[in-house]
Design a protein with these regions (language model features):
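Phosphate-group recognition and catalysis centered on beta-loop-alpha active-site segments
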Residues: 1-265
Length: 265
């Protein structure tokens, strides 16, 4: 019944397929998006993981950003440093100097001891001309000033054509769009595909970024009719990658970008 509702809502539209999406060198049908870098083999959200992702064939790296007490934008998934570093405490309660003293590799193994939490500026510099970025803004207590900082960095690094901002909090994306309409946005969701399509279309988003569990061929068709790309997460098994490619997804976020590269030939 859900897909009958899709048809009734969308069948009177006839929007051409997106011809202005990301088009990186080597992109062949499906965008290879490294989830927190090549995080299956390297410490997530580190410079090593991003460099390895590029080497493994990723055309885009997905990452997460948080803000330090003194206003720096750092690349880390959690709002605390407990899980991924040798420290403890909230990211927002620490200065950048304190964050930089933490070891972001030791929990992944002794071979990665000494890895540091990078700033967004550092990752933008590393990936410049090498791959795109999907910058996820977490949903808790995000301020307009934080969004403004991220927009400024994207513009100042000349990354408007290769970067996008995504979030589960679509209000955050509305703020980003208000601050800098040229920045592409992607709406994250783990449920309610019809609501996701509606919101993304109304916001003129680059993409919907649905959890793999809710991706179907019908969803991809409906998204494409709305001029929306479908970037799904997080997919590590080649068999599942093949199925999603057959459905018509435009991008796959994976912890193992080398697997998607091999599958794509």
């Amino acid at each position: 019944m859900l897909w009958k509702s899709f048809s009734s809502v969308w069948n009177h539209y006839n929007v051409p397929r997106n011809e202005t999406g990301f088009d990186f060198p080597g992109k062949d049908h499906v965008l290879n998006i490294a989830h927190r870098g090549a995080s299956g083999r390297f410490p997530e959200n580190t410079m090593t993981a991003f460099a390895a992702a590029i080497e493994a064939g990723a055309q885009m790296c997905e990452l997460d950003v948080q803000r330090t007490r003194d206003g720096a934008v750092v690349v880390i998934h959690d709002d605390t440093v407990d899980r991924t570093t040798d420290g403890r405490g909230a990211v927002g309660a620490m200065t950048l100097d304190e964050i930089k003293r933490l070891d972001a590799g030791i929990r992944f193994g002794d071979d990665f001891k000494g890895e540091r939490i990078p700033t967004l500026e550092e990752v933008l510099a590393l990936t410049d001309g090498r791959c795109g970025l999907n910058i996820e803004i977490k949903s808790d207590g995000v301020e307009r000033e934080f969004c403004h900082l991220i927009c400024q960095m994207i513009v100042s690094h000349g990354a408007l054509a290769t970067a996008m901002v995504s979030s589960f909090d679509w209000n955050v994306l509305a703020v980003v769009r208000d601050l800098e309409p040229r920045i592409r946005i992607g709406l994250l969701a783990s449920r309610s595909p019809l609501r996701l399509l509606n919101a993304a279309f109304e916001m003129r988003a680059e993409s919907i970024n649905p959890k793999v569990d809710i991706v179907t061929e019908e969803l991809c068709v409906a998204a494409h009719k709305r001029n929306l790309n479908v970037y799904t997460w997080t997919v590590d098994e080649p068999a599942q990658m093949r199925r999603l490619i057959a459905f018509g997804v435009d991008g796959i976020m994976t912890n193992y970008p080398e697997r998607l590269r091999e599958l794509m030939g």
